[in-house]
From Swiss-Prot:
Keyword Cell inner membrane applies: no
Disulfide bridge positions per record: C79-C172, C122-C134
Function of the molecule: Lactoglobulin is the primary component of whey, it binds retinol and is probably involved in the transport of that molecule.
Secretion signal, residue range per the UniProt entry: 1-18
Family statement: Belongs to the calycin superfamily. Lipocalin family.
Protein name: Beta-lactoglobulin
GO MF term set: retinol binding
Species assigned in the record: Trichosurus vulpecula (Brush-tailed possum)
Amino acid sequence: MKFLLLTVGLTSICAIQAIENIHSKEELVVEKLIGPWYRVEEAKAMEFSIPLFDMNIKEVNRTPEGNLELIVLEQTDSCVEKKFLLKKTEKPAEFEIYIPSESASYTLSVMETDYDNYILGCLENVNYREKMACAHYERRIEENKGMEEFKKIVRTLTIPYTMIEAQTREMCRV
């Protein structure tokens, strides 16, 4: 019984340390993110309804002020182009995004990228600093780069979440 309690305690400590050790990238070269990205999969909180990660990214652009502009393609009856402004923050890999339909602000953090193949990002509620959704994007469809890194990030989510794999036939093509 003592061994079981010790094992559970040590496992909990390791899990807490793993959660605290995954942060956004220390440095980010925004210019290398420019271009299209295809969503591969997403993990999001059960109650999280914002569709930002449900879309392919047609274009990432840098504004003269150093912010990012995302042009995404949303699948409705047809493909609709939408633009989002991501305002830079003090941290190079974190951007603030306001979503008018939700009347809420979120922090979009670039967790990991190799710039050429994949990018992993997470949305956090600005008020609660809790990850609400994380997504895995690739430059080319079906490359499967960054899968292990994405799984590590998903394991740090502290809330119940749903995994959603992209159905490329149902998504707008970039």
